Regions:
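Short beta-strand-centered aromatic/proline hotspots
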Residues: 15-23
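Intrinsically disordered, low-complexity, charged/polar segments
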Residues: 35-84
């Protein structure tokens, strides 16, 4: 079964991408994007850069769960920012 790499990039704004996994080792994940671009991810770099990632079988339910979980995380971050701004006003 085909596996998918889900990556949440934290580059100033919330963005999640998915990649088809072609080869996975202990240290790297070789992928191909939807547009055909090949990419190699080093797992240590993903962890070091605080990027969330999971590798799962290509399953629509898993994909939806991942995106919903990350949307919740995004909302929690926004709520924290609003609460911080309210504290600063007081």
């Amino acid at each position: 079964m085909e596996k998918i790499l889900y990556v949440e990039f934290e580059e100033g704004k919330f963005k999640t991408d998915t990649f088809i996994v072609k080869k996975e080792t202990n240290g790297t994940v070789e992928t191909i994007a939807k547009d055909g671009t090949k990419r190699k991810f080093f797992k240590s770099n993903l962890e070091k850069n605080k990027q969330n990632y999971i590798i799962e079988p290509n399953d629509e339910i898993k994909e939806k769960e991942f995106f919903l979980k990350n949307k919740k995380t995004e909302m929690e971050k926004i709520i924290e920012q609003i609460n911080d701004e309210i504290k600063n006003l007081n």
